[in-house]
Each structure stands twice: as structure tokens, then as C-alpha cells.
């Protein structure tokens, strides 16, 4: 591969260094060069006290791919597209949405966005600032820009792929040209993604001349040494359950488990802020119930990923049984010809409510149908792993990973139901039993690089998990920065998760402040946002001192309430109006001083 070097005056290299570099890279492919660019960028960022030098933009880097990822799927797809474009000898820059300088969007000529959706149709956390900018009055006209959008979502949520729809619609509204039609993909997105990637490459080959091709720098810092693990979502590590302990009281309405998994000598590495992906098997009793309701035996042969398996085994290990969706209800209504289900199809809100509140097995019980094994399999979605915020640091627990699991339990018509993964970990997986796991790295939820920086942690319920990891890491590092925890749950006596550990951190001086909100211990309900509001003046002082703010937990209610409270206290104590307070919080996001891990 040959490239035209930029003027040496623009490079932080001597002519001799540049000559050695050009000689060294001659044997590498474009894809390998792109990987190396991220690898060396990651090395620079890992060196204490180093100053990152902004890469010089190549005039040939005419395609920008933005990854707006929540659980890693959008990032992986964006990386695959980047590799496809490089293989086609096209110039491409891949950038994490959280690192994208969105005010430069008016200069983009060819733009591709791979966007996931979280919560109630909101953009991925790393894309919030970009989304806000595009929907603000400051968004520029994009008459010279051409774009493509791939949306990732989950049809079990009402606002399916809303983030992708938002980006696609707004870019067009701002005058940009749509290169290809937007794709809205469910959890089983691989086939759609493969076809879309091919289409995008062909379209871009006609728009971006290949003779000028040069691999773009991964603006996000891309490849990290921790990402070089042989284990992944597709090839998980088989680890062993070491500890399973209930950490809520007997009288608690919540069943929360502290789970410790032994990684052995696997070499699997993670950082505070990362998530643990857990593969699970469905409850055999649930499988039997579903099979019997459909008058099947369970030994019928079915095809799954090119293999022939007995139906019961396929249902246990390959398909989602605990999460219903509107497309499943739609398909089952047609198969069962049930009048009640057919009546729901005309009412979107009623259909969504039914799918959300009625497990598949109960839908079948309420509306019996005569299905064969293949029809049943065709109705269901593939099993997907669940992600749990990691509650430990390898600085303290080198060969272990801990998670905090809220077990989902409820009744439907007097029958006990439970979450697929949470009940697997709590009820069916025995100590020393095998569990398949992988690490989902989350660079959008990281402790400050400077150990002297103050930290404010807001995590009610199981949202406390990553902050246990944060404190273990700060303790091991001897970090001098102040630490403030806001935690809440229904009852002090039953629901104070990791109480002894927090009390020890307070006693040792590591945890500077702790504010606790017990919503059911008094007549009026008190939540973490109420405690945050009470301490508004002091929170503002910490922010002025450079504090980083972290929020973990429920995306639909808690995280929104906390953000509104932060806006209120910034406006009140910072002397700003609502618009300026919102801009201030957006700046904190861009500076990585306001980070959220919400779900």
C-alpha cells in the first residue's frame, strides 16, 4: 500500500522517524494499519502524565462512521463497516459518538451513523450530546452532506429503534441527502446488517474515489489492550460460580444476590465501569410447561443454526422465552386466530401493554393454538445474554468478577414467573457450576484519570454495583480525591446493599460523604433525587472543584429524575436559566464529567 505523506511540518516526527515509519508499515494491510492506529493511541492514553497529540486529519478521509453504542452491538457493527470500507480501499474515520466533535458535522460530506436505542426511545448514552445538538437551534444546514443510518433496537420496547429514526429524520430535515434507506433492526440483526454493509460499501465506492484512499485514525482511541481477549459474546469464557449470596433481608420485597464468578487463570481482564455478559439456559420447568400447552412432546427435531436438535433442548438453550414482543403477539394472533389477540392488533398502546405484561407461556395458555415444533421455533427470538454492571475491581479481586443481581419475580394468574438470567443465577446455577461469560467494555463509564479528582456517585438499588468497583479501585490506587455516594432503596433495615463495606469506607475516610434515601421508612417517599436536591449547594461546590458525576440504574424514571434535579441545582446555584443549565450539563458530558450507566 502506498500513501501520500502530509507535509512534514504538520507532523510531530523528524524526517528520519517518518522514513523509518514508512519503511515499517509497508507490509501491513489497510485493516491492520487501522488496528495499529488504535492500538498505539490506546498505549499513549495508558501512559501516566502523557499528553495526547491530536491526529492530523487526512484530506482523503472523506467517510466518517459514527458509532452510537449502548451495549456494544453498534460499536461492533461500525467496526465491521469500517473494515469493509478499508478493504474496498476507501478512506474512513471511525469515531465513538461520545468523542465526536459534533460542531464539525457541517464539514462532513459522507456520514454513516450506527445507532442503538435505550430506555423509552432515547439515544445511547454516548450519543446524547450529539442528539441534543442536532435537535437544537444551533444545528447547521447539511446540504452538502450525504448519509446512511442503521438503527439497532429491541421490539420488546415501545419506541423501537427510535434513536436511529431520530438521526435519520433530523439529518434529512437539515438538508442532508439519504444515501440508502434506514434499517431498523431487532436483536437478531446480523443478517440485515450484512446486507446493509454491502449496500453502503457499493454506494460509497461510487461517491469516494478509491485512488485517494487512506485509513482514518480511530478518533475514539479504539483498540485497548484489555480488548485483546480471546473471549467475546460469540466465544464466551466458561467460568465457575464461586459465591451466591442474598444481600437483602428476609422481610424485603426485593431479592438481590451478590454473585462472585471465578475466572481462574483465563486472563480475562476488565475495568471498573465495564459490564459482565452472562449467557443462561431457560428454566426446564418453563420449557416443559410451554411444550405441554401446545400438545407437543419436546423430542421433535428442529433446525437451529444449521444443527438438528430436540425441541426441548432448543427451547432451553437457544430461544427467548421470558420476553414477549409485539411482533410475537402479532404472529401468534394469526396462528391462533384468537379474537382477543386479533383485536389488540389495531390498538398499538394496548398491544404494547399486553406484550410487556404477558409472558409467552401465559399468552399460549390464554389463547391455545395447534402449532407444530417448527412453527413454535419460527415464532421466537434467539436467546441473548444479559449484561450486569461489574461490582468489583481486579485490583482487589484479580481472578474474580462480581455482579449484583436483582432477581425478577412476579405472578401471572397465580403462577410464579421469573426473569430468565436472574433466576438462572439465583435459583438454578449451583456453586462451582459452569456459567458462560464475557466482558462488555464501557469506555463511557470510567473513573477520572487523575486520582485527585472528586467523584459523586448516584446509584439506587442495584445501580450501586459499579460504585463498589469504583471504591475498590480508588482504595487500591490510594486515590486522594473525595468520594460522595447517594444510595436509595425502600428500607434501611432490609435493603442497605453492601452496608458493612460502605460503613468501613466511611470509617477509613475513603468515602467522604454518604447520603441515603429510604423511600418507605417514613410517611412521605424519599428518593436519591430528593437527597441530591437537599445537598444542592454542596453538590455545586464539588462540581466547581472539578467533580465527576456518575449515575447508574433505572433509565426510565430514576435517571430522568436525577438529571432534572441536576439541571435545577445547576440553574439555582450556578445562576443560570434552564437553557444555560442544559448547555452546562452537556459540556460536562463532553468533558466526561457526567457519565451514566442506565438500563
UniProtKB/Swiss-Prot annotation:
UniProt cross-references to InterPro entries, sorted A to Z: CysJ, CysJ-like_FAD-binding, CysJ_Proteobact, FAD-bd_FR_type, Flavdoxin-like, Flavodoxin/NO_synth, Flavoprot_Pyr_Nucl_cyt_Rdtase, Flavoprotein-like_sf
Sequence ranges assigned to domain FAD-binding FR-type in this UniProt record: 234-448
Keyword terms, alphabetized: Amino-acid biosynthesis, Cysteine biosynthesis, Electron transport, FAD, Flavoprotein, FMN, NADP, Oxidoreductase, Transport
Cofactor binding remark: Binds 1 FAD per subunit. Binds 1 FMN per subunit.
Keyword Cytoplasm included in the entry's annotation: no
One of the record's GO cellular component terms: cytosol
Binding site for FMN: 69-74, 116-119, 152-161
Coiled coil stretches, renumbered: none
Listed Pfam families: FAD_binding_1, Flavodoxin_1, NAD_binding_1
Flavodoxin-like domain segment(s): 63-201
Family note: Belongs to the NADPH-dependent sulphite reductase flavoprotein subunit CysJ family.
Protein name according to UniProt: Sulfite reductase [NADPH] flavoprotein alpha-component
Amino acid at each position: 500500500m502506498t500513501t501520500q505523506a502530509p507535509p512534514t511540518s504538520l507532523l510531530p516526527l523528524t524526517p528520519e522517524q517518518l522514513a523509518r515509519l514508512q519503511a515499517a508499515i509497508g507490509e501491513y494491510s489497510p485493516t491492520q494499519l487501522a488496528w495499529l492506529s488504535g492500538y498505539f493511541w490506546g498505549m499513549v492514553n495508558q501512559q501516566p502524565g502523557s499528553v495526547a497529540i491530536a491526529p492530523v486529519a487526512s484530506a482523503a478521509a472523506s467517510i466518517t462512521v459514527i458509532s452510537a453504542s449502548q451495549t456494544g452491538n453498534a460499536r461492533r457493527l461500525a467496526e465491521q463497516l469500517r473494515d469493509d470500507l478499508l478493504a474496498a480501499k476507501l478512506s474512513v474515520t471511525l469515531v465513538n459518538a461520545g468523542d465526536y466533535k459534533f460542531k464539525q458535522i457541517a464539514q462532513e460530506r459522507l456520514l454513516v451513523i450506527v445507532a442503538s436505542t435505550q430506555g423509552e426511545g432515547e439515544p445511547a448514552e454516548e450519543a446524547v450530546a450529539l442528539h441534543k445538538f442536532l435537535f437544537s437551534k444551533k444545528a447547521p444546514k447539511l446540504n452538502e452532506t450525504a448519509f446512511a443510518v442503521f438503527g439497532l433496537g429491541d421490539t420488546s420496547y415501545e419506541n423501537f429503534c427510535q434513536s436511529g429514526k431520530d438521526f435519520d429524520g433530523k439529518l434529512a430535515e437539515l438538508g442532508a441527502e439519504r444515501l440508502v434507506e434506514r434499517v431498523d433492526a431487532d436483536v437478531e440483526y446480523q443478517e440485515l446488517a450484512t446486507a446493509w454493509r454491502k449496500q453502503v460499501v457499493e454506494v460509497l465506492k461510487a461517491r469516494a474515489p478509491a485512488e485517494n484512499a487512506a485509513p482514518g485514525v480511530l478518533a475514539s482511541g479504539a483498540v485497548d489492550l484489555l480488548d485483546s481477549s480471546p473471549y467475546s459474546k460469540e466465544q464466551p469464557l466458561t467460568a465457575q460460580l464461586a459465591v451466591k449470596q442474598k444481600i437483602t433481608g428476609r422481610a424485603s420485597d426485593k431479592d438481590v444476590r451478590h454473585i462472585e464468578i471465578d475466572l481462574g487463570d483465563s486472563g480475562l481482564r476488565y475495568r471498573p465501569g465495564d459490564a459482565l455478559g452472562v449467557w443462561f439456559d431457560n428454566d426446564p420447568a418453563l420449557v416443559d410447561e410451554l411444550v405441554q400447552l401446545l400438545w407437543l412432546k419436546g423430542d421433535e427435531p428442529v433446525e437451529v443454526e444449521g444443527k438438528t436438535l430436540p425441541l426441548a433442548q432448543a427451547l432451553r438453550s437457544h430461544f427467548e422465552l421470558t420476553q414477549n414482543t409485539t411482533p410475537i403477539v402479532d404472529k401468534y394472533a394469526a396462528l391462533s386466530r384468537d379474537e382477543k389477540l386479533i383485536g389488540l392488533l389495531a390498538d398499538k398502546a394496548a398491544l404494547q401493554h399486553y406484550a410487556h405484561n404477558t409472558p409467552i407461556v401465559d399468552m399460549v395458555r390464554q389463547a391455545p393454538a395447534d402449532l407444530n415444533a417448527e412453527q413454535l421455533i419460527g415464532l421466537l427470538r434467539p436467546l441473548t445474554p444479559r449484561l450486569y454492571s461489574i461490582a468489583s475491581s481486579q485490583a482487589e479481586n484479580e481472578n474474580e468478577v462480581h455482579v449484583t443481581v436483582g432477581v425478577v419475580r412476579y405472578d401471572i394468574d397465580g403462577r410464579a414467573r421469573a426473569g430468565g438470567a436472574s433466576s438462572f443465577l439465583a435459583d438454578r446455577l449451583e456453586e462451582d457450576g459452569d456459567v458462560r461469560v464475557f466482558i462488555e467494555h464501557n469506555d463511557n463509564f470510567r473513573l477520572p484519570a487523575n486520582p485527585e479528582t472528586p467523584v459523586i456517585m448516584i446509584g439506587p438499588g442495584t445501580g450501586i454495583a459499579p460504585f463498589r468497583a469504583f471504591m475498590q479501585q480508588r482504595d487500591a490506587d490510594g486515590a486522594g480525591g473525595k468520594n460522595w455516594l447517594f444510595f436509595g432503596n425502600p428500607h434501611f433495615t432490609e435493603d442497605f446493599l453492601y452496608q458493612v463495606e460502605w460503613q468501613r469506607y466511611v470509617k477509613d475516610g475513603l468515602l467522604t460523604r454518604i447520603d441515603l434515601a429510604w423511600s418507605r421508612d417514613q410517611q412521605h417517599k424519599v428518593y436519591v433525587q430528593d437527597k441530591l436536591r437537599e445537598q444542592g449547594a454542596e453538590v455545586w461546590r464539588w462540581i466547581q472543584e472539578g467533580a465527576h458525576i456518575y449515575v447508574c440504574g433505572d433509565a426510565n424514571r430514576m435517571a430522568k429524575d436525577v438529571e432534572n434535579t441536576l439541571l435545577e441545582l445547576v440553574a439555582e446555584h450556578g445562576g443560570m436559566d434552564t437553557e444555560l443549565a442544559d448547555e452546562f450539563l452537556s459540556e460536562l458530558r463532553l468533558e466526561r464529567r457526567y457519565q451514566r450507566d442506565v438500563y
